[in-house]
Amino acid sequence: MAEMITEAAILTQQAAQFDQIASGLSQERNFVDSIGQSFQNTWEGQAASAALGALGRFDEAMQDQIRQLESIVDKLNRSGGNYTKTDDEANQLLSSKMNF
């Protein structure tokens, strides 16, 4: 079986990039929400219902995307920590066996 080598620092960097994407989506979501609220008083009838429904679906979809990205960030950060811990434990075990 091939050896798997993982750079914990790269996992952390990737987590930061996903976190930036989630943050950007949150800002865009807030921007769209504010536009929708500003027009809300001028919409009437079916147009208002359709627009509010569309904005609601958009908001739900954006929130789901943000949650998914936050989950990826959490998993990448935990994975990086786990790999570092495993490497440290392996180094300590090797050092103790070889009397370093």
Swiss-Prot record:
Recorded superkingdom: Bacteria
Compartments where located: Secreted
InterPro entries: ESAT-6-like_sf, T7SS_ESAT-6-like
Keywords: Chaperone, Secreted, Virulence
One GO CC annotation: extracellular region
Stored Pfam families: WXG100 (PF06013)
Secreted is among the record's keywords: yes
Main location: secreted
Role: A secreted protein that might play a role in virulence. Might serve as a chaperone to prevent uncontrolled membrane lysis by its partner EsxA.
Self-association and partners: Forms a tight 1:1 complex with EsxA.
Family designation: Belongs to the WXG100 family. CFP-10 subfamily.
Protein name, UniProt field: ESAT-6-like protein EsxB
